[in-house]
Amino acid sequence: MDRLPPPPPPPRQPLPRAQVLAEKAFSALEHFLHIEAVSGIVLLAAAGIALLWANSPASHSYHALWHTPLSFGIGSHLVSQSLHFWINDALMTIFFLVVGMEIRREIHEGALANVRLSALPMAAALGGVIVPALIYLAINTEMPQRQGWAVPTATDIAFAVGVLALLGKSIPGNVRVFLLALAIIDDIVAVLIIAVAFSGGLDYGGFLVAGTGILMVLGLQWIGVGTAYAYVVPGAILWLGMLKTGAHPTLAGVVLGMMTPVLPGRTRERPLDVAMRALLDLRARATARTPKPEHIAAPLKQLRHAQRELLPPVIRVQMALHPWVAYLVMPLFALANAGVSIDGVDLTSGGSLGAMFGVVLALVVGKPLGIVSVSWLAVRLGWCQLPPDVTWRGVCLVGLLAGIGFTMSIFIATLAFEDVNLLGAAKLGVLLASAIAATIGLTWGFIYARGRRPSMERADESTAAASD
């Protein structure tokens, strides 16, 4: 007996115009927020607002806001700190968590997974750390301004990649990969500097608390717990332990990021098979025009679970946190730290002018000089070679963009200087240097892209001729 053909699908009802417009608006917004240059623009806007606010007649409200006490407690245990502390020491832990996961991914499958691939960005990053530090120390020979030697060693990934994105597809993809690898190695060095140079006297009792948090994370991973929410409490314990030790608590984020698995969890059944079965089940149950929720709830739950298990945890968590870091954590950090009162910075006393000038010169000149010169030396000695489609002009572009220190440089400045005047001068230097480096980098990028167009056109013509 022949089987009857399946019934035709019910006719689709036209959506209300308001719903169509809303869906288009949200789709455009989602696409807009995933453009790399946008996060840099938001960060720049936050810094601009902070700078204007701190130099306006309402400047007292700016400083009063960040010194507002905020308390968290459980039972008799109470932690009370300023809003500035919670942003710099707690919220920035999420930023460092993403940094740790980026490092973990690069070590597993990226530019740091292969010694030959990582040799050039490692050499470039080494030059981009040592030369700026030496330039700063050459200008600032006395204490306490010498303590700011690490301020110009960092690179702001979001800003640098955002400026590069403004240049469009005319820049080879390998230039972007080179910049990302260099910036990630810069982050590793910055984390080591924070851990070694800017952690106070260690309280070893705190290591027991931090160790408890790490053991809890390992235990959850061992039994196969995949949901990220389960790791919030162990992460908080690790953060409290790092705070108690005297090390900077944001290092807890790096530790957690480096511990995030890079492979999908072990399951009894392949997630793809589960997803296919759930889709077939969903199609079989959803025959009515408006299927009952209880009929489709189970296959939808299976599909959602399979979708989650298909991605490695390091990618899944990074994708979930990226918009929060790009559009909340980093702009809040910029808003809380970029507000330098220009009238309040006395550049005539206490070496403040030297600190500011040292930061500017080290970032704008030292960064590209160190990156290009050490890269050239490493290639000349045969230790590594330039990636495909990357010329020395491209290396110069990377060096110029690496001079955008911004977020990480300001963060290190807040750790390096206790003197308010020196801290203000260093922050002002970072802001000036980042603006100058971005402007020069963008200008050089347009020149570099224009010079590549004739060769790209010749390559397209030769490809077309070969196909004919």
UniProtKB/Swiss-Prot annotation:
GO cellular component terms, A-Z: plasma membrane
Reactions catalysed: Na(+)(in) + 2 H(+)(out) = Na(+)(out) + 2 H(+)(in)
Transmembrane segments: 32-52, 83-103, 119-139, 148-168, 178-198, 205-225, 320-340, 354-374, 397-417, 428-448
Keyword entries, A-Z: Antiport, Cell inner membrane, Cell membrane, Ion transport, Membrane, Sodium, Sodium transport, Transmembrane, Transmembrane helix, Transport
Statement: the UniProt record of this protein carries the keyword Lipid metabolism: no
Pfam families xref list: Na_H_antiport_1
Subcellular location(s) per record: Cell inner membrane
GO biological-process terms attached to the record: regulation of pH
One annotated GO molecular function: sodium:proton antiporter activity
Membrane disposition: Multi-pass membrane protein
Keyword ATP-binding: no
Matching NCBIfam families: NhaA
Protein purpose: Na(+)/H(+) antiporter that extrudes sodium in exchange for external protons.
Entry similarity comment: Belongs to the NhaA Na(+)/H(+) (TC 2.A.33) antiporter family.
Stated name of the protein: Na(+)/H(+) antiporter NhaA
